[in-house]
Amino acid sequence: MKQEIQTGDITALSFEQALKQLEVIVENLERGDVPLEQSIDIYERGEALRKHCDRLLKAAEAKVEKIQLSEEGSPKGVEPLDSK
């Protein structure tokens, strides 16, 4: 079933919205029934969506913190994930 490819501002999309649009683009391209010019256009949008998803993942990764435990095993604070 051919799904509609969204247009508009990619930067306003959440990770989940961008990923869903990227999945629709892949499905449409894999079917092979999209005209060449349209294939190029949606491929370019797909690449922009992929980059947007990558930026959002990197931003989320930077926010992830590792919980530090005391010698007794109870939480005593947090530190950046990449600190050690």
From Swiss-Prot:
Main localisation: cytoplasm
Gene Ontology terms describing biological process: DNA catabolic process
Localization, UniProt: Cytoplasm
Recorded GO CC terms: cytosol; exodeoxyribonuclease VII complex
Keyword annotations from UniProtKB, A to Z: Cytoplasm, Exonuclease, Hydrolase, Nuclease
Assigned EC number: 3.1.11.6
Gene3D superfamilies: Exonuclease VII, small subunit
Top EC group: hydrolase
UniProt entry tagged with the keyword Isomerase: no
Function: Bidirectionally degrades single-stranded DNA into large acid-insoluble oligonucleotides, which are then degraded further into small acid-soluble oligonucleotides.
Family designation: Belongs to the XseB family.
Quaternary organization: Heterooligomer composed of large and small subunits.
Protein name stated in the entry: Exodeoxyribonuclease 7 small subunit
Source taxonomy: Bacteria, Pseudomonadati, Pseudomonadota, Alphaproteobacteria, Hyphomicrobiales
Encoding gene (name): xseB
